[in-house]
């Protein structure tokens, strides 16, 4: 047959990928159908923050998602990958604030709320566009017409609906409680936004005088209180000891005089106190410490707030009861000397004043963790502020049961324990933030401070019967970003409207996310979804059936990637490549800490001396899938990326060999299939089976390795080579059989690999389509291969394994003895079974061609070969006569190594057989098999030793 056409020598991703993607998108291949009865499959993407661009973690998770989406689309499921971005309140507001400060020298207050928010919308339009273009470059098969943003009108309506309903159910309330307060950004922040930094600090031991003549067991008239935060002592409302601490039991219920403030506070007993810490006596400051806050609630202590929102000492303390309301009748004046002082200035003065009064007992060095706001960059302050809260316990109970009873499964399973530990000890959730960017809280206040909650002001007036002359002002605060994110799976499908999409695609199938947001996002999605979404029988619906938890992508040294470390890798640079100069600019430009630039530049030059070369999207995706071992962090590996680029080239070259082969015969007529044809078909069907099993278990690494192993090690390295003798010497029927098998396996292999490497598989498939006269416009809508058990052929596999081992043995002898491939060798075989003889006769031409043999001769059992190099394949002896080209010393060394290797195997089996535990537990047939193996090794050693002696006498 004449050549079909020409194919480029190498696959060029940059010439193919973007054009292919535009074609896919324009043809609507990513869209689900409107068929409400079709089996559906849906993934909701974790929405990237609109603040910037995608990083390697996004590329990693999105590759896994797209693999599942493409697979399910090929399986015939009505498939939706719901995408969008998150408004990321505090992060986005800070980016834009920094931008206007740098470019215009202005603050948000110079703009005012409305104008500043318009600035953020402009930024969102720019940044969101960048993210969606990057996602296209990754090959993500997303329905872009359904792209959502957490502050879209539809999603905003869902947020208001949830807030109002929860408020009406008594599950949202406003109260004064302790929160993480960022004194620089002037907002409450979540635990996720708090970074605990190791710090060398001090433990101050202060003397608090006992009141009313009381004495300790040692006769002292004071208690020594240990603290790491002297600046909060003006707000102390008790000192606490452990109830079983005998040193202080007699003092429980008595009082001390709080130094500097000169007021009496009680000595209380609480099991929270660690008897071993400091002196076993701690000060309790409920308004400025989370643990003290809980102690205060247990003991009904007043909360004395001594700090402003700037973290300066107040002129007048704010005194709050345990109910969160102002407390009358408790006096806690702040001495004038401290009023207005910044907190750390106040700390120094308080310590100095204790010393001047003779009340500073001692100062000890102390290692501690100081909580910092991860964006404001200053120590956060536990602060009593008015905030909105969700009472989540009732929601958490339902959400916990969903995981307990298996409605939702975590992969890997160990993350369920992390989920349970959080959910079973859940606290009310502070949902308000003192920001401008975000969902404004749907609550209004009249001039008397009464609060009205509704979806908008018009509804407030009708719901509460307020006339137009009643002035109303909306709450200034916005909702925590996680509040709107928690509605993501159903709000993006049109809720609160009962849409067709909601019916078709909810619950979604799997969520792929990082372990660090299991509580902050995953748990809240489960709680909100099960509270608001019910099936037709009124049963709470889960947001997804499986949560697949990924590890982090770290750099090659195992370090977390971060801008400050200068080790961030951009997935687009892996695809397109980047020069060293541009990489240096990217890593050191616009740094928050410019002093690190030189160190980062040096490390970058060392690691990427010539920049990063282009690898294409498929190589990046294949690498990410291959590295995805369950739940573990991943160290990025450029060598693996290069290796998988080579893999893509290998697939391209194999396809080129097939499609441009001048003897490819697709004519009608009888076809005869060779042993190699039957073997590759059997191996391929086992590969399909292994792929499906691995994907079902979310073992993306095994999925990738399965494709790699078959393509490289079986199809390319063996089968393509095995076709050459057929095309050279076979009958027409044999050529037709091999031609059909080549094309059939290649076409199915492209379909098998398509979910992970979509571009190269589509490009080759389009070329193959014409040759094979296939119907269909795109590979992505072709059916995914199913394993056909009828094609499993253990006999062909066994025979082919034997032939391959013989070929490898002969090739190894050539290499070890430095014999040219052009020199045809004689092959002598001894100790061959009747079954193997038949296999040999049927495949003699193939074996001669593949191993480059002049003759193949069978020896009788007792027939001695001429002086030869010997190899063993199973129990078969292989001899290559060495007359004229043996290197005696080299051959003796090789035999010695072979004998030592077998002796090692014998020692291993002897150890096993002398192990009582093994002998007791192992089945009899396993023990018999080990003994049989050992005897085989002993026989082989004897034969090799005879060979050694024969060569030694040369």
Curated annotation (Swiss-Prot):
The gene is valS. Keywords: Aminoacyl-tRNA synthetase, ATP-binding, Coiled coil, Cytoplasm, Ligase, Nucleotide-binding, Protein biosynthesis. PANTHER family: VALINE--TRNA LIGASE, CHLOROPLASTIC_MITOCHONDRIAL 2, VALYL-TRNA SYNTHETASES. Its main location: cytoplasm. ValRS has two distinct active sites: one for aminoacylation and one for editing. The misactivated threonine is translocated from the active site to the editing site. One of its GO terms (molecular function) is ATP binding. It comes from Histophilus somni (strain 2336). CDD domains: Anticodon_Ia_Val, ValRS_core. This is Valine--tRNA ligase. The keyword Ligase applies. Gene3D superfamilies: HUPs (3.40.50.620), Isoleucyl-tRNA Synthetase, Domain 1 (1.10.730.10), Valyl-tRNA synthetase, C-terminal domain (1.10.287.380), Valyl/Leucyl/Isoleucyl-tRNA synthetase, editing domain (3.90.740.10). The keyword Glycosyltransferase does not apply.
């Amino acid at each position: 047959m004449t050549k079909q056409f020409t194919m480029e020598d190498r696959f060029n991703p940059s010439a193919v990928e973007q054009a292919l993607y535009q074609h896919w998108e324009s043809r609507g291949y990513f869209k689900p159908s409107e068929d409400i009865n079709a089996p559906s499959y849906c993934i909701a993407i974790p929405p990237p923050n609109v603040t910037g661009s995608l990083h390697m973690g996004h590329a990693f998770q999105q590759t896994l998602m797209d693999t599942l989406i493409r697979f399910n689309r090929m399986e015939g499921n009505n498939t939706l990958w719901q995408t969008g971005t998150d408004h990321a309140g505090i992060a986005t507001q800070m980016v834009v604030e920094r931008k206007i400060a740098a470019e215009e020298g202005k603050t948000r207050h110079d703009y005012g709320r409305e104008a500043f928010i318009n600035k953020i919308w402009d930024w969102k339009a720019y940044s969101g566009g960048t993210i969606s273009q990057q996602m296209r470059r990754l090959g993500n098969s997303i329905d872009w017409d359904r792209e959502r943003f957490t502050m879209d009108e539809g999603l905003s309506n869902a947020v208001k609906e949830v807030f109002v309903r929860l408020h009406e159910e008594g599950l949202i309330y406003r109260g004064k409680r302790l929160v993480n307060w960022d004194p620089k950004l002037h907002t409450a922040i979540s635990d996720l936004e708090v970074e605990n930094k190791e710090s060398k600090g001090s433990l101050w031991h202060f003397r608090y005088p006992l009141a009313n003549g009381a004495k300790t067991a040692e006769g002292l008239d004071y208690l020594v209180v240990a603290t790491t935060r002297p600046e909060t002592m003006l707000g102390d409302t008790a000192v606490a000891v452990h109830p079983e601490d005998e040193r202080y039991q007699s003092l429980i219920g008595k009082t001390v005089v709080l130094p500097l403030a000169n007021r009496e506070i009680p000595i209380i007993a609480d099991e929270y106190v660690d008897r071993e810490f400091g002196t076993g006596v701690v000060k309790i400051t409920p308004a400025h410490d989370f643990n003290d806050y809980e102690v205060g609630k247990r003991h009904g202590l007043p909360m004395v707030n001594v700090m402003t929102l700037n973290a300066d000492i107040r002129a007048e303390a704010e005194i709050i009861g345990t109910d969160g309301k102002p407390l009358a009748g408790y006096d806690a004046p702040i001495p004038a000397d401290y009023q207005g002082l910044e907190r750390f200035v106040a700390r120094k003065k308080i310590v100095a004043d204790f010393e001047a009064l003779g009340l500073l007992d001692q100062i000890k060095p102390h290692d501690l963790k100081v909580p910092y706001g991860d964006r404001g960059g200053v120590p956060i302050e536990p602060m009593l502020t008015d905030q909105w809260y969700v009472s989540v316990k009732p929601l958490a109970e339902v959400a916990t049961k969903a995981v307990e009873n298996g409605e939702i499964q975590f992969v890997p399973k160990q993350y369920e324990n992390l989920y349970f530990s959080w959910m079973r000890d859940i606290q009310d959730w502070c949902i308000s933030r003192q920001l401008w960017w975000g969902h404004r809280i749907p609550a209004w206040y009249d001039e008397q401070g009464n609060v009205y909650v509704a979806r908008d002001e018009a509804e407030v007036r009708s719901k509460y019967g307020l006339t137009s002359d009643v002035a109303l002002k909306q709450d200034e605060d916005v909702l925590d970003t996680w509040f709107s994110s928690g509605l993501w799976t159903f709000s993006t499908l049109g809720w609160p409207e009962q849409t067709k999409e909601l019916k078709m695609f909810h619950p979604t199938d799997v969520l792929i996310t990082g372990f660090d947001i299991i509580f902050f996002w995953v748990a809240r999605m489960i709680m909100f979804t099960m509270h608001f979404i019910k099936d037709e029988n009124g049963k709470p619906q889960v947001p997804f059936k499986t949560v697949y938890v990924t590890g982090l992508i770290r750099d090659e040294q195992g370090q977390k990637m971060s801008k400050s470390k200068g080790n961030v890798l951009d997935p687009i640079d892996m695809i397109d490549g980047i020069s060293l100069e541009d990489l240096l600019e990217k890593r050191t430009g616009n740094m928050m800490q410019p002093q690190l630039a030189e160190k980062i530049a040096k490390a970058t030059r060392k690691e990427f001396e010539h920049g990063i070369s282009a690898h294409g999207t498929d190589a990046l995706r294949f690498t990410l899938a291959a590295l995805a071992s369950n739940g573990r962090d991943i160290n990025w590996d450029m060598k693996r990326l290069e290796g998988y680029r080579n893999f893509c080239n290998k697939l391209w070259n194999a396809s080129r060999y097939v499609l441009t082969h001048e003897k490819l015969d697709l004519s009608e007529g009888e076809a005869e299939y060779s042993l190699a044809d039957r073997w590759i078909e059997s191996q391929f069907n086992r590969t399909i089976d292994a792929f499906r099993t691995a994907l079902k278990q979310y073992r993306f690494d095994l999925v990738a390795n399965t494709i790699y192993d078959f393509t490289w090690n079986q199809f390319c390295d063996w089968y393509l080579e095995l076709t050459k003798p057929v095309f050279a010497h076979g009958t027409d029927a044999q050529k037709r059989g091999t031609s059909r098998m080549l094309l059939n396996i290649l076409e199915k292999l492209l379909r098998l690999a398509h979910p992970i490497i979509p571009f190269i598989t589509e490009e080759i498939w389009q070329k193959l389509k014409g040759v094979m006269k296939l119907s269909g416009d795109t590979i992505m809508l072709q059916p995914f291969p199913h394993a056909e058990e009828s094609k499993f052929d253990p006999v062909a596999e066994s025979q082919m394994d034997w032939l391959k081992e013989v070929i490898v043995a002969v090739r190894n002898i050539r290499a070890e003895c430095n014999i040219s491939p052009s020199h045809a060798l004689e092959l002598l075989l001894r100790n061959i079974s009747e079954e193997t003889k038949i296999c040999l006769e049927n495949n003699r031409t193939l074996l001669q061609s593949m191993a480059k043999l002049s003759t193949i001769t069978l020896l009788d059992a007792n027939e001695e070969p001429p002086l030869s190099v010997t190899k063993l394949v199973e129990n078969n002896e292989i001899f290559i006569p060495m007359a004229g080209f043996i290197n005696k010393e080299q051959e003796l060394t090789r035999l010695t190594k072979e004998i030592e290797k077998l002796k090692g195997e014998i020692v291993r089996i002897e150890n096993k057989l002398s192990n009582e535990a093994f002998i007791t537990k192992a089945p009899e047939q396993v023990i018999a098999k080990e003994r049989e193996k050992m005897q085989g090794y002993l026989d082989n050693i004897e034969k090799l030793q005879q060979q050694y002696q024969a060569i030694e006498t040369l």
